[in-house]
Amino acid sequence: MSKVAIIGAGPCGLSILRAFEHLEKKGEKIPEIVCFEKQESWGGLWNYNWRTGSDQYGDPVPNSMYRYLWSNGPKECLEFADYSFDQHFGKSIPSFPPREVLQDYILGRVSKGNIKNKIKFNTRVINTVYRNDKFEINYQDKVNDKTLSDTFDYLVVSTGHFSVPFIPEYEGMSSFPGRIMHSHDFRDAEEFRGKNVIVLGSSYSAEDVALQCNKYGAKSVTIGYRHNPMGFKWPKGMKEVHYLDKLDGKKAIFKDGTEQDADVVILCTGYLHHFPFLDESLKLKTHNRLYPPKLYKGVVWQDNHKLLYLGMQDQFHTFNMFDCQAWFARDVIMDKIKMPSDDEIDKDINKWVSMEEKLENPDQMIDFQTEYTKELHNISDYPKIDFELIRKHFKEWEHHKVEDILTYRNKSFSSPVTGSVAPVHHTPWEKAMDDSMKTFLNKR
């Protein structure tokens, strides 16, 4: 019987554990599986941790979640095909839930089986090499400070790529008298009440961190973009300007000549694909893009078909795309899907990369990733889900944000699994200061 190592028990790792569980429940024999998770619990990025910097064992804290974080996309677009929100909560819930609600949903799907028994918690993978047709993995039991090793036939890397921040350098940083932090360490917008906040970036983190700071009472929020502005109709107290030139004392000076008082600078400058636990020959090297190179179907490592990566793309689709990738990866491991020739693999990768390079706007990007996810869905037995409806929802969501960036979370969408329409939340997002699950689910 073959052995499979999975690194990471966040959403991607849980997806492939779930995929194997589906086969096992149908009476099929599955490989021996060991999942290594360096945190003390499962859920990955969705675990909130007050810590920043290092954990109690000296490892970097992987968590980037913060208080008052609400989903910035419709929950219907990430719904699991085999476990609906209606099933989990026993009723329809609003389309934009806070973090705790989504975490409860993610873990609810995997808590009922024996998936947890396959996970080694508080376990850090130190290094991995491929030798004699096996993956040799050295790992540390962090609680008992023991180093152990094991060998595996297949390796699935499901660590995500939103835990190692990219931190650029700007003139004047070393002498800036205020605070400089990456969004990875952002934990509570209340901390910046009455402050002049500079947010550097132009993607989802910058958008949400800036809105959070405004919502919870920042004196001003100035967003500095590098290439293209987000271009939303920002509420009072917020503005978007072109690219930070330098910090001069407590002033931020931008390329367009704007000068702004600054108490804190928050770097929403993205993350690195970082795999220090892999031998150099096994590492995926890419920036954040919709179709990383050298991955067949976005999953199988071109140079070694026993190495599989999950969730390494820039993302519109998330949980159900991870599931489609996981079902595909499972079937490759189980030899239910035969790998084509090297030439065919190369041709397929180049086709997707070439299409990605021609994308010009969010609608095209949504179409691209929807078609990619549908292709994976069609070649596995992942349960039925309406990806055309999800495509439509994503485009409506983008339109709602353009209409009003402050109120788009107050909209409702229909489930691609059950068809039920989400109710309107009892409190508009811009006025909802309590993000607890209890308050969200129960009308006051």
UniProtKB/Swiss-Prot annotation:
Q: What is the effect of changing Y170A?
A: Retains 5% of wild-type activity with DMS as substrate
Q: What's the effect of swapping H227A?
A: Retains 60% of wild-type activity with DMS as substrate
- InterPro entries reported in the protein's UniProt record: FAD/NAD-bd_sf, Flavin_mOase, Flavin_mOase-like, FMO-like
Q: Which Gene3D superfamilies match?
A: FAD/NAD(P)-binding domain
Q: What is the effect of changing E37A?
A: Retains 15% of wild-type activity with DMS as substrate
The record lists the effect of Q315A as: Retains 5% of wild-type activity with DMS as substrate
Substitution effect: D314A: Retains 45% of wild-type activity with DMS as substrate
List the coiled-coil residues. none
Q: Per the record, what is the consequence of mutating S203A?
A: Retains 20% of wild-type activity with DMS as substrate
Temperature dependence as stated in the record: Optimum temperature is 25 degrees Celsius with DMS as substrate.
The catalytic activity of this protein is classed by the Enzyme Commission as 1.14.13.148
**Keywords on this record?**
FAD, Flavoprotein, Monooxygenase, NADP, Oxidoreductase
**Which positions in this protein are listed as binding NADP(+)?**
W70, N72, Y170, S202, S203, S205, R226, H227, N288, R409
Q: Which reaction does it catalyse?
A: trimethylamine + NADPH + O2 = trimethylamine N-oxide + NADP(+) + H2O
Pfam families to which the protein is assigned, alphabetical: FMO-like
What does the record say about pH dependence?
Optimum pH is 7.0 with DMS as substrate.
Which cofactors go with this protein? FAD
Binding site residues for FAD: C12, E37, Q39, L45, W46, N72, V125, Q315, T318
One example of the protein's molecular function in GO is: NADP binding
Q: How does it assemble?
A: Homodimer.
Q: What else is known?
A: The catalytic process consists of a reductive half-reaction and an oxidative half-reaction, via the formation of a C4a-hydroperoxyflavin intermediate. NADP(+) undergoes a conformational change in the oxidative half-reaction.
Function (record text): Catalyzes the oxidation of trimethylamine (TMA) to produce trimethylamine N-oxide (TMAO). In vitro, has a broad substrate specificity, oxidizing many nitrogen- and sulfur-containing compounds, including dimethylamine (DMA), dimethylsulfide (DMS), dimethylsulfoxide (DMSO) and methimazole. TMA shows the highest affinity.
Q: Which family does it belong to?
A: Belongs to the FMO family.
Question: Under what name is this protein listed?
Answer: Trimethylamine monooxygenase
Which species is listed as the source? Pelagibacter sp. (strain HTCC7211)
Gene label = tmm
